[in-house]
Amino acid sequence: MGSDTAWSPARMIGIAALAVGIVLGLVFHPGVPEVIQPYLPIAVVAALDAVFGGLRAYLERIFDPKVFVVSFVFNVLVAALIVYVGDQLGVGTQLSTAIIVVLGIRIFGNTAALRRRLFGA
């Protein structure tokens, strides 16, 4: 069985790790430190942008795991950095809104491409 098959060991480890993480989160209810709370929604939206971009690339058969991981981490860090700088300048709310709008447009663009690819609509 090659690493590109549907049931490869690497894929199964990833799925198992995701399942364990979800269960642990539901059982232990981890708290988010107050320092990080303003940046968490932005980080989640940035991560969703990378995930939907990765799904689109996978369906278009141009997915590269290295590009996905770098995109995921870079999106989250840059979005958080922009909000942090905005907070320091006193315009954090406006920059947060701008980031949500930009990433939201990208997410909807990727979901539209996914819909066209999957359903031909």
Swiss-Prot record:
Membrane-spanning intervals of the chain: 12-32, 35-55, 67-87
Membrane topology reported for the UniProt record: Multi-pass membrane protein
A Pfam family per the record: DUF1290
Gene Ontology cellular component list: plasma membrane
Alphabetically ordered keywords of this record: Cell membrane, Membrane, Transmembrane, Transmembrane helix
Cited InterPro entries: DUF1290
Cellular localisation: Cell membrane
Protein family: Belongs to the sbp family.
Protein name per its UniProtKB record: Uncharacterized protein Mb1855
Species in which this protein is naturally found: Mycobacterium bovis (strain ATCC BAA-935 / AF2122/97)
